[in-house]
Amino acid sequence: EIKEGIVTGGKIALLDISGRMSVKNIEEAKASRDEIIGFEIVKTALEEPFTKLIENAGLDAGQLIAKAREVSAHGQGFNVLKIDSAENAIPVDMLKEGIIDPVKVVRIAVQNAISVATMILTTEALITDIPEKKEPQMPGGGMPGGMDY
């Protein structure tokens, strides 16, 4: 039993939420610069799971995002197991295909995206790891003396 219900899977629900978010609306609401930046962070964060899913399937995420946005409001998306290229992708009814996500999982993903955006906006500085330069490994040594026949 899934207590909170289900939504279209394949990260289409998150992409649909992102697609419905309009910077114009928040600007009209006279939001502060920080609020607009936070809004854009959340919007981008909501697109990322779909992008990763498509990239992991070896497909072009840029093309499929545009196609998915056109059909996501109708509960349609793509079964990545059945498409071989973004050009040939045909939208399917996600619920009929059995591609679903529990609402709780989607809700928590949205809450986490908002939490990260809030943390970034309220932090004076962010600390990250500096990528280490890896020195080339030593080449293999020569054969010791007396080993030639």
Regions found by a protein language model. Give the residues of each.
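Extended, low-charge hydrophobic alpha-helical regions
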Residues: 1-149
